[in-house]
Amino acid sequence: MAGIFAITNYTADREILVSYFINSLQMLQHRGKAYWKIIIDNLVSSGIGPFPAESSIPKSDNDNSNLRYMIGLGYLSKRIPRFRSMNKIGVVLDGFFVDIEKLHLHPLVGDAANADSLYKIYCIFKKLLIDQGNAEKACEFLDRHLRGNLTMMYDGKIYSYRDSTGFKPLVSGTDKNNSVSIIASENSLRIPFPNMNFEDVRPGQLIKMDVENGQQKILSLPTTRTMIDPFEFIRESHVTATINGKGIYETRKRIGKVQADFLSTHSNIDIDAAYAEPDYPRPMNLGFSAEYRNHIPKFDLGEAIINDRYDDSDRMIDFSENISKNKMITSGKSLKYILKHKISQKNIGLIQGTIQTGITAKETIYYLRKVGVKSVSVIVSYVPSVDGRQVGLYTHNRELIAHKYIGQVPSLEELNTRISKELGANKVFYNSPSILSKGIGISEYNLWFPEWVRFLEYEKK
């Protein structure tokens, strides 16, 4: 394992920063570390063996003219870094990574897909934390893969995270004059700096340091998680179930309401009416329609459904939805169906609970077009289904239509476009984890999603 530390000097005195680096490195080398590396702003120095004198600290023409920020990182280990990317990025690691085999498929990995694991994690973490400004999701991502501590220096700021298991110690402190702050993975640094007020960084905590704002605790993830299957709120929950004091029916209406609010504001959706297919997304349709009408007053508040596969008169439905004849809008076999004159030459929204294999959606779209609709937009209450565990293995057909796009699309917009072409729809709008969790009323952190789905979001927000 390694020893890591980060130092921020709030004064313009370079010598103070250098002295803290020297003392930190020398103290940590007593633990038998052989390889050392220091980064002060954009200046880098490294070596193997005992740490030499101050002359090995990176110089800037003996002044501070090229130092934009009085901050830096230190790293010590018994061996040279495992990851070559440490030579080009401002990241130090004390610990190891887990479950990294499929990181190259992550929707946010971008051009780092073929890089080493540290660089992949650095790029995704930076994109979530810096580019998207989502500290909670950034820390959740790290927590999936990090066992230990990771510290990153970027644009004059230090970010240090301790994973929620508390696998490795991490301390932070500021001197009594509020002139220097330190984050370190070794408790032994308390010895050379008796004037520092050190305290333990809690597991799951993200610390930020910069010269303008000092040391800040940005976020603390819960150390325990109650993971809930979000599919329960789409289909499987018992009708008497409650969440946050509300019945499951009201929760499902809210899922539709939140999705309508998002799509009407942040997408190019254009529909005149929306209908559920089959029966179980009807609450989502009611919530969706009521909210959508707040944005589009002429929207038709129809409560009919396109197809009721749960009509007990059709016993075949209990055995195979692929074999049974779906009772579509023109058949009249269902007690609930919409009439041709209600939808002809209109832009119709098709509210689906999920899209699994796509068979149901394709057939419904076929019949809608047959009766003369102007366009069909498929609105999916659930997130993309790419794993049988997401739908309780409800279908024995494992060829989930979205599965082949894992690692192929960086955003929900692109996935929507590809799936719409496969289904023959004009448009498709999947729900996203963040929008779905808002509708359910439970933090994304406590809902279970496969990693690729968890970080697949809409770009335009």
Regions flagged by a language model, labelled:
Residues 14, 167-168, 190-191, 215-216, ...:
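Flexible loop/turn segments at secondary-structure boundaries
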Residues 157-158, 162, 179, 196-198, ...:
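PRPP-dependent phosphoribosyltransferase catalytic core
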Residues 268-280, 377, 428-431:
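Short glycine-rich phosphate-binding loop at a beta-alpha junction
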Residues 290-348, 386-397:
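Short, glycine/charge-rich flexible loops or terminal/linker lids adjacent to PRPP-binding catalytic cores
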